[in-house]
Regions:
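Asp-based, Mg2+/Mn2+-dependent phosphohydrolase catalytic module
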Residues: 2-31, 36-57, 62-65, 70-90, ...
Length: 296
């Protein structure tokens, strides 16, 4: 009997979230590139979050921002995103802080900090002292110190010195790059990959790693309980990063909606199901539906 190859199921191209929302009872939504661009929020995305929350279930913002959720909320609000269009925020920065709190529980943690001073509140209140590489027990990578002008290769000497001492890097943002307005900037994930290439040990917090999805689903369940609804059984993950948002959703067993005009915008043309499927195969990530931008 001849072997018959099953047909490839192409992703569904949709014009808005309303076309598939009824199939889901919770939304796990990326932030940067989906609901804001690092400068201002996307009103159509905010409306989509409102509508889903009103009609179908809780909305949890899941971000690889290297900040605690309260700081992420302040930032999102400053960009114009209404805080009542979502139920909770789960951040990689919050998860990384929890790790450092455990490491600093018994004695002062000597930490080599890689990131801008504006993100230092992430470790405020912990028994941590910033230290040079020769004294540090662990390194925290939040991002480049000046992501507007620097690139990861400028950190080669620093990373080699860390590797020589066998320092573990805690990466609070696994994203490689991100859009800020029209610019593409490097994130802490790029530093982490460079450190791994040297043989260094990296502990990642955030997407695509499973624990952050467990935290997001737990937050969705709490929000549902507070609204006297059943715990979500059919959550949908939304994001524009194939290696983080979509691959992470796949690993967590969640259906995914890919936002095509985000970080991969230049790679998503022509905008056809066949091209999207080839893009998914190239990145090893799969979304069941695709839309250009998040809207209802």
């Amino acid at each position: 009997m001849a072997h018959v190859t099953p047909p490839i199921m192409l992703p569904r191209l949709i014009s808005g979230l309303s076309e598939i929302a009824a199939n889901h009872d919770a939304l796990i939504c990326d932030v940067w590139g989906v609901v804001h661009d690092g400068a201002r929020h996307h009103p159509a995305a905010a409306e989509a979050l409102y509508r889903f929350k009103e009609k179908h279930g809780p909305v949890v913002l899941l971000t690889n921002a290297p900040r605690v959720p309260a700081e992420v909320q302040i930032q999102c609000t400053s960009y114009g995103l209404p805080p009542d269009c979502y139920d909770a925020i789960v951040s990689s920065g919050g998860a990384a802080r929890d790790d450092l709190a455990i490491r600093a529980r018994d004695k002062t943690l000597l930490l080599h900090y890689i990131g801008p001073d504006r993100d230092l509140p992430m470790i405020a209140g912990l028994d941590i002292r910033r230290a040079p590489i020769e004294e540090a027990k662990v390194a925290l990578a939040i991002g480049l110190r000046d992501d507007m002008t620097e690139t990861p290769d400028m950190y080669a000497v620093e990373l080699k010195a860390m590797r020589a001492r066998g320092i573990t890097m805690v990466c609070a943002n696994p994203d490689l790059v991100v859009h800020r307005g029209e610019r593409l900037l490097y994130c802490a994930g790029s530093l982490a990959k460079a450190y791994e290439a040297l043989g260094g040990e990296v502990v990642y917090y955030g997407k695509p790693h499973r624990p952050i999805y467990d935290s997001a689903l737990a937050a969705a369940a709490l929000a549902a309980k507070a609204a006297n609804k059943q715990s979500p059984k059919r959550p949908l993950a939304v994001g524009d990063g194939l290696l983080t948002d979509i691959k992470g959703a796949n690993g967590a067993g969640l259906e995914a909606l890919f936002i095509a005009d985000g970080v991969h915008g230049e790679e998503t043309q022509p905008y056809t199901g066949e091209h999207m499927e080839s893009l998914f195969l190239r990145f090893g990530a799969k979304a069941s539906a695709v839309t250009r931008a998040l809207k209802w």
